[in-house]
Amino acid sequence: MEQPPASKSKLKKLSEDSLTKQPEEVFDVLEKLGEGSYGSVFKAIHKESGQVVAIKQVPVESDLQEIIKEISIMQQCDSPYVVKYYGSYFKNTDLWIVMEYCGAGSVSDIIRLRNKTLTEDEIATILKSTLKGLEYLHFMRKIHRDIKAGNILLNTEGHAKLADFGVAGQLTDTMAKRNTVIGTPFWMAPEVIQEIGYNCVADIWSLGITSIEMAEGKPPYADIHPMRAIFMIPTNPPPTFRKPELWSDDFTDFVKKCLVKSPEQRATATQLLQHPFIKNAKPVSILRDLIAEAMEIKAKRHEEQQRELEEEEENSDEDELDSHTMVKTSSESVGTMRATSTMSEGAQTMIEHNSTMLESDLGTMVINSEEEEEEEEEEEEDGTMKRNATSPQVQRPSFMDYFDKQDFKNKSHENCDQSMREPGPMSNSVFPDNWRVPQDGDFDFLKNLSLEELQMRLKALDPMMEREIEELHQRYSAKRQPILDAMDAKKRRQQNF
């Protein structure tokens, strides 16, 4: 594999002089690394230092100053366990975000390339670095909100670093992007879904889900519809491994401590760093073989794609000369969902699936206000993080975009399905309010019900879910409309100016 050039001097951040130049004067863009829901990512070299960097090119349509202001917050972070942010440029209609380059890619990329899930030793080593990154962010009073294998990057030495803590989410919230994948809730903590207020330990729940994802190839509930998952996560018991007997007691206990439904009882990053599963983690050198294997596979695939492109171009030229007809493209379209992953227990190999289905646009870094920071400072002693009560976050999960599409369809048939959209007395009688799932998760009362009553409750779950989805949709619509009105008013003032 191509080795990055030797650094003339290590890049810490872009100088003021560099930021006043055009980005092409400061960087040599080498190749495209990938396509995200919010833009393209390129590999580039910083000319002055010779250091390899990653550049995200994000289309910007409005509120540029607000985006730049939010991105600048990332400059506060300086940790070897967090992907560094060097600066940003505005060129034409794109925002160029310059960040640290991690040559091995994300953990989910490595799993997908190798068609194998990770071993316990590999998972423990990755989790140790990830927890150190979370401990740093949480001490800085920042919540990642999008912890998953796709946002844990590895460099070629095997060091894991947290990525996209705030950038992707903040841009998503501000830009009103189009053609994005519906955000999935599989990694989200119950308190985030329930909108009851949350703090840093919401990331710990996501880390527990990520642990299962690395071990099994996908998070719990990945095989069901995301809209159903948002009701199962808060109401069901915490998820665990599909086959617990395959995993050690230490690993099982670590995941159990992450996936405690009550945030007050959930462990912090600092506490989990003392867990035996993490304390016994092996050095990062154990990751080098799987990184080398993944990078070799990636290089071979790149060569194959180049050959296929050359052959397609040759065939295209011949077809155009012969018949002037359109050349048929590959039958596999972008975004097509493949079969979900399966794993053979012996070799831990897994059939590759399209991870796009599991991609999430939910990552938004939450910055506490100055008043909250002052309160938190009073609660800190001897460098140990103390929990603080947080008010409900005024944010709209991306999976609610699904409701907007459904609402549009419903309005076009409003005259013929009004009775279905408005639950009548009969639907209310099927699941009275006292049948709602208890918030404390205590289901012991079910033992006292008759078989007939239990069957009726089970039958009522689906219509109950539909009604709760409709109520949730109406609640978010009521919150969303004033924001849209304010944005429209702001745009009109700018146009008049």
Swiss-Prot record:
User: Mind telling me which residues the site (Cleavage) is annotated on?
Assistant: D322, S323
Residues annotated to bind ATP: L33, G34, E35, G36, S37, Y38, G39, S40, V41, K56
An example of a GO molecular function for this protein is: protein serine kinase activity
State the activity regulation.
Inhibited by the C-terminal non-catalytic region. Activated by caspase-cleavage. Full activation also requires homodimerization and autophosphorylation of Thr-180, which are inhibited by the proto-oncogene product RAF1. Activated by RASSF1 which acts by preventing its dephosphorylation. When autophosphorylated at Thr-180, recruits STRIPAK complex and promotes PP2A-mediated dephosphorylation and inactivation of STK3.
Compositionally biased residues, Polar residues:
326-343
PTM entry text: Autophosphorylated on two residues Thr-174 and Thr-180, leading to activation. Phosphorylation at Thr-117 and Thr-390 by PKB/AKT1, leads to inhibition of its: cleavage, kinase activity, autophosphorylation at Thr-180, binding to RASSF1 and nuclear translocation, and increase in its binding to RAF1. Phosphorylated at Ser-15 by PLK1, leading to activation.
Q: Which residues form the active site?
A: D146
Gene3D superfamilies registered for this protein in UniProt: 1.10.287.4270, p53-like tetramerisation domain (4.10.170.10), Transferase(Phosphotransferase) domain 1 (1.10.510.10)
Q: Where in the cell is it found?
A: Cytoplasm; Nucleus
Span of domain SARAH: 443-490
Q: Which residues carry this modification: N-acetylmethionine?
A: M1
Q: According to the UniProt entry, which residues carry Phosphothreonine?
A: T117, T180, T336, T384, T390
Q: Which InterPro entries match?
A: Kinase-like_dom_sf, Mst1_2_SARAH_domain, p53_tetramer_sf, Prot_kinase_dom, Protein_kinase_ATP_BS, SARAH_dom, STE20/SPS1-PAK
Positions modified as Phosphoserine?
Answer: S15, S316, S391, S450
Instruction: Give a short account of what the protein does.
Output: Stress-activated, pro-apoptotic kinase which, following caspase-cleavage, enters the nucleus and induces chromatin condensation followed by internucleosomal DNA fragmentation. Key component of the Hippo signaling pathway which plays a pivotal role in organ size control and tumor suppression by restricting proliferation and promoting apoptosis.
**Family note:** Belongs to the protein kinase superfamily. STE Ser/Thr protein kinase family. STE20 subfamily.
- What protein am I looking at? Serine/threonine-protein kinase 3
Q: Which gene encodes it?
A: Stk3
